């Protein structure tokens, strides 16, 4: 690693310790050229997968788009900002745990629907109406029947 003081390209590690949380490593380094010491931290870099759109285009995952989807579906519903944030974090964590480089946008939509189903059934129907492109009242009736017929402990069947 380059020395931040004299910019010599090679430094040596004189001490390494794992943090109490176990999620990073603290390293004390020494520059052989200027003899100064400094600390670095090593952490795991987790990357969210690229989103493959329905038209085949690819885009970086955008947490703000995820937030917008939740906020629109939950507009004027009795769900706290903390619950929305927790649901978003669960979606992001699922994406990270997949370990994939790419994910189809419809899979993210299904994850969002699953979280909305747990949070608020009206928001679930709102999101489903846009996500599944409801064409009329019959589509709403089907979705409501699906909700009414499903066990309260499980998510409704996904297409």
Swiss-Prot record:
This protein's record includes keyword Lyase: no
Residues covered by the ATP-cone domain: 49-139
Reported cofactor(s): Zn(2+)
Cofactor note (record): Binds 1 zinc ion.
Zn finger (unnamed) location: 3-34
Entry keywords, A to Z: ATP-binding, DNA-binding, Metal-binding, Nucleotide-binding, Repressor, Transcription, Transcription regulation, Zinc, Zinc-finger
InterPro entries xrefs: ATP-cone_dom, NrdR-like_N, RNR_NrdR-like
Gene Ontology molecular function, alphabetical: ATP binding; DNA binding; zinc ion binding
Biological process annotations from GO: negative regulation of DNA-templated transcription
Protein's job: Negatively regulates transcription of bacterial ribonucleotide reductase nrd genes and operons by binding to NrdR-boxes.
NCBIfam families: transcriptional regulator NrdR
Similarity annotation: Belongs to the NrdR family.
Protein name: Transcriptional repressor NrdR
């Amino acid at each position: 690693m380059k020395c931040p003081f004299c910019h010599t390209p090679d430094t040596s590690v004189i001490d390494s310790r794992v943090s109490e949380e176990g999620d990073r490593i603290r390293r004390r380094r020494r520059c052989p050229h200027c003899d100064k010491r400094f600390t670095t931290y090593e952490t795991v870099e987790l990357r969210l997968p690229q989103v493959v759109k329905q038209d085949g285009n690819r885009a970086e995952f955008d947490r703000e788009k995820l937030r917008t989807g939740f906020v629109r579906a939950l507009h004027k519903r009795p769900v706290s900002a903390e619950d929305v944030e927790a649901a978003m974090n669960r979606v992001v964590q699922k994406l990270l745990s997949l370990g994939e480089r790419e994910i189809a946008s419809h899979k993210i939509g299904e994850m969002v629907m699953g979280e909305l189903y747990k949070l608020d059934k009206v928001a679930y129907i709102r999101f489903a109406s846009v996500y599944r492109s409801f064409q009329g009242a019959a589509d709403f009736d089907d979705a409501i029947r699906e909700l009414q017929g499903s066990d309260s402990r499980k998510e409704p069947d996904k297409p």
